[in-house]
């Protein structure tokens, strides 16, 4: 007698959701960007990694077997010529650009007192997190508009929708990424181009460690961070991973999201939908 389980596809038989697509991932050499690159390749995409971390980018290409479907290009997202060159390199190598992932970002130095915040540090965060995203959108659009299709995805944060989760520059920059996402989606919709962003809750990466309060730190900062994040999470019993964020990006890049644009996809376990101060449902 047949059962429902007999109709469930094994992981090996699941469709490659990005087969034949060409993607460019900024900040793709490490952290969330690396996870996105790995999952894109798993789903059949050809990928160009754009990063300032040359050694790590080359290492990742070698990890993926040195395939002709993976490439690295040095790119500082604050320099428009670098981004233009990375986009053109991708098109020259793979023939087109279907997916642009603006992942490169920094959190900036912790600074609990606005009176002490150095403007040079503020400017650096905005240069990378906002200017870099805008330049990526601009040059992706340059290729995608004539093709009348494409998907632009930017990595934002839960700090895109609420305050008190990070330094002023970081929070302001992530609000700006959300604003750019909505506005660019409004312009590019007529060209068949989708523009979205992904806003995860805290993930254990070197970038995120800067957000851990000094009072919560011991000798093992990674464990401290994971414990702090778990204690403040809304969804319990599940730890957010870089792969979870990458899965959200794959969804937005795929045809499964073909009518999704202007969206801020929250990968936060309901964190931003909860008033943590009231704690109405806490025992």
UniProtKB/Swiss-Prot annotation:
Positions annotated to bind NAD(+):
27-33, 51, 76-77, 103-105, 170, 174, 205
Q: What is its EC number?
A: 1.1.1.198
Q: Which GO terms describe its biological process?
A: (+)-camphor biosynthetic process; abscisic acid biosynthetic process
Reactions performed catalytically: (1R,2S,4R)-borneol + NAD(+) = (1R,4R)-camphor + NADH + H(+)
Q: Name one Pfam family in it.
A: adh_short_C2
Q: What GO molecular function annotations does the UniProt record carry, in alphabetical order?
A: (+)-borneol dehydrogenase activity; xanthoxin dehydrogenase (NAD+) activity
Which CDD domains does the record cross-reference, listed alphabetically?
A: secoisolariciresinol-DH_like_SDR_c (cd05326)
Q: Family per UniProt?
A: Belongs to the short-chain dehydrogenases/reductases (SDR) family.
Function, in words = Involved in the biosynthesis of monoterpene natural products related to camphor. Catalayzes the oxidation of (+)-borneol to (+)-camphor. Shows absolute selectivity towards (+)-borneol. Catalyzes the oxidation of (+)-isoborneol to (-)-camphor. Shows absolute selectivity towards (+)-isoborneol.
Note the NCBIfam families from the entry.
PRK07231.1
Q: What is this protein called?
A: (+)-borneol dehydrogenase 2
Native source organism of the sequence:
Salvia officinalis
* Organism ancestry: Eukaryota, Viridiplantae, Streptophyta, Embryophyta, Tracheophyta
């Amino acid at each position: 007698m047949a059962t429902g389980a007999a109709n469930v596809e094994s992981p090996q038989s699941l469709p490659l959701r990005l087969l034949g697509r060409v993607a460019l991932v900024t900040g793709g050499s490490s952290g969330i960007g690396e996870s996105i690159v790995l999952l894109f390749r798993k789903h059949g995409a050809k990928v160009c990694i754009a990063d300032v971390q040359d050694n790590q980018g080359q290492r990742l290409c070698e990890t993926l077997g040195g395939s002709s479907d993976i490439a690295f290009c040095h790119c500082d997202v604050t320099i428009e010529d670098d981004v233009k060159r990375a986009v053109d390199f991708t098109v020259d190598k793979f023939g087109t650009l279907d997916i642009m992932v603006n992942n490169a970002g920094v959190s900036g130095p912790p600074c609990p007192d606005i009176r002490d915040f150095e403007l040079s540090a503020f400017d650096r965060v905005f240069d990378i997190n906002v200017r870099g995203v805008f330049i990526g959108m601009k040059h992706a659009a340059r290729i995608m508009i004539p093709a009348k299709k494409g998907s632009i995805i930017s990595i934002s944060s839960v700090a895109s929708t609420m305050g008190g989760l990070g330094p002023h520059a970081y929070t302001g920059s992530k609000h700006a990424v959300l604003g750019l996402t909505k506005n660019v989606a409004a312009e590019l919709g007529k060209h068949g181009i989708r523009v979205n962003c992904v806003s995860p809750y805290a993930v254990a990466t070197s970038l995120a460690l800067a957000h851990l309060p000094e009072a919560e730190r011991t000798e093992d900062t990674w464990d401290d961070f994971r414990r702090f994040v778990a204690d403040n999470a809304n969804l319990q019993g599940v730890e957010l991973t870089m792969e979870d964020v990458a899965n959200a990006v794959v969804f937005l890049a795929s045809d499964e999201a073909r009518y999704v644009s202007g969206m801020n996809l929250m990968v936060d376990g309901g964190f931003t939908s909860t008033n943590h101060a009231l704690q109405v449902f806490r025992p």
